[in-house]
Amino acid sequence: MKKLTLSTILALTTLMALGQSDIPRVYEVENTGSQLALPVMPEPDQLPVIHELPDALEGVNSFADWQKRRSDIAHMIQHYGIGEKPAVEPSQVKARMEGDSALVVDVTVNGETLTLRSVINYPKSGQPPYALMIGTSMISLPKQLFENRPIATMTFHESQVNDYSQWRPHHDRGEHNFDRLYPNLVENGAYSEWAWGLSRLIDGLQQLGPEVTKIDTRHIGVTGCSYAGKMALYCGAFDERVALTIAQEPGGGGAAAWRKSHESKENVENIDKTDYHWFLESQREHFKGDSVYQLPYDQHELCAMVCPRALLLLGNPDYPWLADDAMQPSAEAANKVWEHFGIGDRMDLSIIGGHMHCQLPEVQFPIVEKFIDRFLSEK
């Protein structure tokens, strides 16, 4: 069994001048940088070659600078990697509860309506409003991690937005529910659209309020495994209302750096060998092979977008395709952002083998419980 945690390979550097109490754990809005000027996006062939992982902290001298840097990273990832996650006005969202536990959210854009429906499973202990863990496609973490905690759970059914699947019949690109609302974004990858969908569920929870939903929207987590681990990471990175993101075995295109997976001698998921329903086709066109070094960002910066909120990455080295050897340096590079602000303990990595894919071993329970208790239950 291979066991590795970020805390064993990185020394946490605390900035004495900046205490954790000064740094928010979560925000009440989806995107704090929504009013910032958009960065210039050069044509791909005009981008410089960068062999090392790009500096996530470029131009950042203080926490106040991070909002702009984070916004720039978000725009790069959308422009070159996954496609646009469009903003939605509050007036375009109408939420209601059906029965005691079903959240229904109607989103109307350009005269078209998309309906999201998810059942909230309330805990048997504690008092409302409850913290909430949302599973992307499902919650693959063991049920016992939530059964004895005052945390509600809910599934984001991504097929309600974009029904692409590697295992079942699905619509083609441009024919998904999302595309009815945004026909100009038919080239989008699924991850931008799925992140959009989860944000609309949070819109609905906020609109109805804790008196109706029994949910504390300042304590929302998101988790998923494999392709849904990537989904959880994109959802958490692109919505600052998510307090805790747990990406389980997300593989290439998730937390694993594209540059590092390109250099791997193993058969791993890299920028040439991923599923391009998830990403912009233009990403493969412009950044395949050694052209990956012209990508102006890498996946450590997707991870860093979660900062200053909490992020836990879980790996499994028994499945080389997951590219954990590329996730480790990516996580180390991302953690430097949290460390820079004296909050390095809000992010961690745990890579442990000896178990099946998406089956969390008991030896990993403590680190998951630590993050759940600290950032959802605030123990």
Role assignments for model-derived ranges:
Residues 20-83:
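N-terminal pre-domain segments of enzymes
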Residues 117-120, 128-137:
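Short beta-strand element of the alpha/beta-hydrolase
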Residues 135-218, 251-254, 258-260:
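Cap/lid segment of the alpha/beta-hydrolase catalytic domain
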Residues 224-228, 232:
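Gly/Ala-rich beta-loop-alpha elbow adjacent to hydrolase catalytic centers
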Residues 248-302, 323, 327-331, 339-344:
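Mobile cap/lid helix-loop segments that gate and shape the active-site cleft of serine hydrolases
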Residues 307-325:
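Conserved strand-to-loop "acid loop" that flanks and positions the catalytic carboxylate
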Residues 332-379:
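C-terminal catalytic histidine-bearing segment of alpha/beta-hydrolase fold enzymes
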